[in-house]
Design a protein with these regions (language model features):
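Acidic donor-binding/catalytic loop of UDP-sugar-dependent glycosyltransferases
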Residues: 68-73, 88-105
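Conserved alpha/beta core of the MobA/IspD/sugar-nucleotide pyrophosphorylase nucleotidyltransferase superfamily
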Residues: 131, 150-216
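Conserved donor-nucleotide/metal-binding helix-loop-beta segment in metal-dependent transferases, i.e.
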Residues: 95-121
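Conserved nucleotide-sugar donor-binding
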Residues: 81, 128-140, 184-186
C-alpha cells in the first residue's frame, strides 16, 4: 500500500475489481496444487487487503513492513511449503503460463532458485521467482543488508557459487514493455488493455502481442 508514486495502487480499480484481486486470481492459476498466500504488512493501512485475500482463497500472513524476507520465510513455515513462488502485487496482467515455465524449470533442475529476471526478457510485470524453502531460510538467517531483507531474493542470486540458479528466457526480448503498475500512466494503459482483451478471459502474453501487432 505504501507506493510513493501511486499510493494504494493495489486497490485501484480495473474492470470493476481491485488490482490485487486480479493478481491473486492469476497467481492461483500458476499451479492448481499450490497454496495461495497473501503476505502483507501488519500495518493498519494494509487491513483492507485482508478481505480481498480471503475472498480469493488466500492464506493471510502478516509481518514487518520493511523486512519482506521475514514475511516470505514465515509464509513458507506456516504453510510447510518446500518452495515459494514470488509474485508482487503490482502485476495485474501477470501471465500464469509464463510463471508456470519458471516453476517447471525449478522443479526439473534440482535448483535453489529460478526466475525470468536474470536477465529479463519478458515484459516488466511478468516477473516470477521461485525459491526453495531451504534457501529462503538461509537468506532469512544470514542476510543483514537492508536491501536483501526488503527485496527477498538478492541474498540468493548474488551468491551463484552457493545457490543453484536458473533463468527462463523468451525467444523474443520484450523486457522494455511496461505491463506493471507503478504510475498513473501505467494504470491507464493497463485499464485500456484489460478493456480490449477481457472478453478472452485470463488473457496472457500471446493475446497482448497479437493486440499490439493489430494496432501497429
Amino acid at each position: 500500500m505504501g507506493s510513493s508514486r501511486l499510493p494504494a495502487k493495489v486497490l485501484a480499480d480495473i474492470g470493476g475489481r481491485p488490482v490485487l484481486a486480479h493478481v491473486l486470481e492469476r497467481a492461483k492459476l500458476i499451479d492448481s496444487d499450490a497454496i495461495l498466500v497473501l503476505a502483507i504488512p501488519s500495518a493498519a493501512s494494509d487491513d483492507p487487503l485482508v478481505e480481498i485475500g480471503v475472498a480469493a482463497g488466500a492464506t493471510i500472513v502478516r509481518g514487518s513492513t520493511d523486512d519482506v524476507l521475514d514475511r516470505y520465510h514465515q509464509a513458507a513455515r506456516q504453510t510447510a511449503a518446500d518452495a515459494v513462488v514470488r509474485i508482487t502485487g503490482d502485476c495485474p496482467l501477470l501471465d500464469p503460463a509464463v510463471s508456470a515455465l519458471v516453476v517447471d524449470r525449478f522443479r526439473t533442475g534440482d535448483l535453489d532458485y529460478a526466475s525470468n529476471v536474470h536477465p529479463p526478457t519478458y515484459p516488466d510485470g511478468y516477473d516470477t521467482e521461485i525459491i526453495s524453502s531451504a534457501a529462503l531460510a538461509a537468506a532469512w538467517r544470514e542476510a543483514v543488508d537492508p536491501y536483501e531483507r526488503e527485496h527477498v531474493t538478492p541474498f540468493i542470486w548474488r551468491r551463484p557459487d552457493r545457490f543453484r540458479s536458473a533463468n527462463v528466457a523468451d525467444a523474443v526480448d520484450r523486457s522494455s514493455w511496461r505491463l506493471t503498475l507503478d504510475t498513473a500512466e501505467d494504470l491507464l494503459q493497463i485499464r485500456k488493455l484489460h478493456h480490449r482483451l477481457r472478453q478472452r478471459g485470463t488473457f496472457g502474453l500471446a493475446e497482448i502481442v497479437d493486440l499490439r501487432q493489430t494496432i501497429a
